Regions:
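The feature captures the beta-strand-to-loop junction immediately N-terminal to the Walker
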Residues: 32-37
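Catalytic Walker B motif of ABC-type/P-loop ATPase nucleotide-binding domains
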Residues: 150-154
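Conserved ABC transporter NBD signature motif
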Residues: 58-72
């Protein structure tokens, strides 16, 4: 079953399209990483799926319903980001009680255990928390809601490294015990790739690819060797990224269609694997080049 279905989804903001004819499907009970540069359209997509915003054109379905102003979607979807706001009249304990009333699958015991583990006090006020503590409390809401579609938009903003690790471990343990569809938008792909089953990479509001983690890890390889040999050997291959290393050596990343590894070794070319996070950066680099080109 597909929890999310988008066809030719377009969202215009001002004079620009934040999303451009985006077509995707996301299956139930999966953890998907939503990856892209700032301004790629990640937050726009998540807010449309959550029913916060209405699409300009195209079709979007969540649980086979149009999410905008859908009570069913509102009760079964949660969108967590660092801009979540709560009434200044409510204490943290009050917020948890209200969440218990609203979300049908709310796990009060899990919320209480996480609340104690991260050293919150019942009478604290959300707006008075530090940025990292706000993100941590928001994470508790996201996990304890047990919504069938749970979306985290840069959920670890402001968190210490140790808290981020605790969050990812808590998310994975709770997902394994209570499977649901989870989408995580993050700039820290290297931190979450072990959690993910799929990666959706978007660039300029369009889908670049939607692959399983296994497919992504096999997508490309790195080649290092003498510049002349690398240029000749990659002439008919799709080069994703290339840079000069020293005077006569080049490193490049090529799509892994058919790579004769033995021939490469005979030519003195070193073949290496590519980290998923690095590959996504290479794929979405601006056409005008990298930062090194500024100093030429």
């Amino acid at each position: 079953m597909n929890v999310v279905e988008c066809k030719d989804l377009t969202k215009k903001q001002g004079q620009q399209n934040a999303l451009n004819d985006l077509s995707i499907t996301i299956k139930e009970n999966t953890i998907t990483g939503l990856i892209g540069r700032n301004g790629a359209g990640k937050t726009t997509l998540l807010k449309i799926l959550a029913g916060y915003w209405y699409e300009t054109a195209g079709e979007v379905r969540v649980f086979n319903e149009q999410p905008f102003q859908s009570l069913f979607v509102s009760a079964n979807v949660i969108y967590v980001d660092d801009q979540m706001s709560f009434s200044g009249r409510l204490t943290l304990a009050d917020i948890l009680k209200e969440a218990n009333r609203f979300y049908p699958k709310w796990d009060a015991k899990l919320a209480e255990r996480l609340f104690d583990y991260f050293s919150f006090q019942p009478n604290q006020i959300h707006i008075h928390l530090s940025k990292g503590k706000k993100s941590t409390f928001n994470m508790i809401i996201g996990l304890a809601s047990r919504c069938a579609l749970t979306m985290f938009d840069e959920p670890t903003t402001g968190m210490d490294a140790s808290v981020r690790k605790d969050f990812y471990r808590a998310l994975l343990k709770d997902y394994l015990a209570h499977p649901r569809t989870i989408i995580i938008s993050s700039h820290h792909l290297e931190e979450i790739e072990d959690l993910l089953e799929d990666v959706l990479l978007i660039e300029q509001g369009k889908k670049y690819f939607h692959l399983s983690m296994d497919e992504l890890k096999e997508y490309a390889v790195g080649l290092t060797g003498r510049t002349e040999i690398i240029e000749q050997w990659t002439a008919n291959k799709e080069v994703i990224y290339s840079r000069q290393i020293g005077k006569d050596t080049t490193y490049c990343v090529v799509k892994r269609d058919y790579i004769p590894f033995e021939q490469a070794k005979q030519l003195g070319i070193e073949v290496s694997s590519i980290a998923a996070s690095d590959l996504c950066v290479y794929l979405t680099r601006k056409q005008k080049g990298g930062i090194d080109d500024v100093f030429k």
